[in-house]
């Protein structure tokens, strides 16, 4: 794992097309902005896990009884 230190307003690059910018820090929360091409999915980890679980178990989708 690469560990970086950034201040508010500073940006890091992932590849040539994805940027992550620190927008603010308040207590133990950090606001970040992500700029990425439309074909690159960007999700919080818990949302990503939910999407993966729904892909692996289609019967778990709401409305399917």
Swiss-Prot record:
<keyword id="KW-0963">Cytoplasm</keyword>
<keyword id="KW-0010">Activator</keyword>
<keyword id="KW-0810">Translation regulation</keyword>
<dbReference type="InterPro" id="IPR003751">
    <property type="entry name" value="CsrA"/>
</dbReference>
<dbReference type="GO" id="GO:0006402">
    <property type="term" value="P:mRNA catabolic process"/>
</dbReference>
<protein>
    <recommendedName>
        <fullName>Translational regulator CsrA</fullName>
    </recommendedName>
</protein>
<dbReference type="GO" id="GO:0006109">
    <property type="term" value="P:regulation of carbohydrate metabolic process"/>
</dbReference>
<dbReference type="GO" id="GO:0005829">
    <property type="term" value="C:cytosol"/>
</dbReference>
<dbReference type="GO" id="GO:0045947">
    <property type="term" value="P:negative regulation of translational initiation"/>
</dbReference>
<comment type="subunit">
    <text>Homodimer; the beta-strands of each monomer intercalate to form a hydrophobic core, while the alpha-helices form wings that extend away from the core.</text>
</comment>
<dbReference type="InterPro" id="IPR036107">
    <property type="entry name" value="CsrA_sf"/>
</dbReference>
<comment type="function">
    <text>A key translational regulator that binds mRNA to regulate translation initiation and/or mRNA stability. Mediates global changes in gene expression, shifting from rapid growth to stress survival by linking envelope stress, the stringent response and the catabolite repression systems. Usually binds in the 5'-UTR; binding at or near the Shine-Dalgarno sequence prevents ribosome-binding, repressing translation, binding elsewhere in the 5'-UTR can activate translation and/or stabilize the mRNA. Its function is antagonized by small RNA(s).</text>
</comment>
<dbReference type="GO" id="GO:0045948">
    <property type="term" value="P:positive regulation of translational initiation"/>
</dbReference>
<keyword id="KW-0678">Repressor</keyword>
<comment type="similarity">
    <text>Belongs to the CsrA/RsmA family.</text>
</comment>
<dbReference type="Pfam" id="PF02599">
    <property type="entry name" value="CsrA"/>
</dbReference>
<keyword id="KW-0694">RNA-binding</keyword>
<dbReference type="GO" id="GO:0048027">
    <property type="term" value="F:mRNA 5'-UTR binding"/>
</dbReference>
